[in-house]
């Protein structure tokens, strides 16, 4: 029975790893395109919600400008959780507590900031 040449085994492993790397690079590109599409849609929805909020009550009427207005929370009760989270973060910032941001979240934030949006995504017609 012939023995396998160690160099051919190494070459085969290198080709396999290289092919996997190429596949992951393609997946990364696809995911970034999908993320851009999702971000554009979310930005459009936020713009519409802000215009509804401005028309109903005005964002300046909330105790903390960064909170979602009570009128909007009444329309969509699931948003109350987000107001609770915003309040929690605001309290920590007021008490000068450090907030640890995970590396994955920093990567997502960097990707968010580097994603180009169209003018219409952030402006109502």
From Swiss-Prot:
InterPro entries: Ies5 (IPR020366). GO terms for cellular component: Ino80 complex; nucleus. Keywords: Nucleus, Phosphoprotein. The keyword Kinase does not apply. The keyword Nuclease does not apply. GO terms for biological process: chromatin remodeling; DNA repair; regulation of DNA-templated transcription; telomere maintenance via recombination. The modification Phosphothreonine is found at residue 124. It comes from Saccharomyces cerevisiae (strain ATCC 204508 / S288c). Pfam families: IES5 (PF17335). Component of the chromatin-remodeling INO80 complex, at least composed of ARP4, ARP5, ARP8, RVB1, RVB2, TAF14, NHP10, IES1, IES3, IES4, IES6, ACT1, IES2, IES5 and INO80. Present with 2280 molecules/cell in log phase SD medium. It is found in: Nucleus. This is Ino eighty subunit 5.
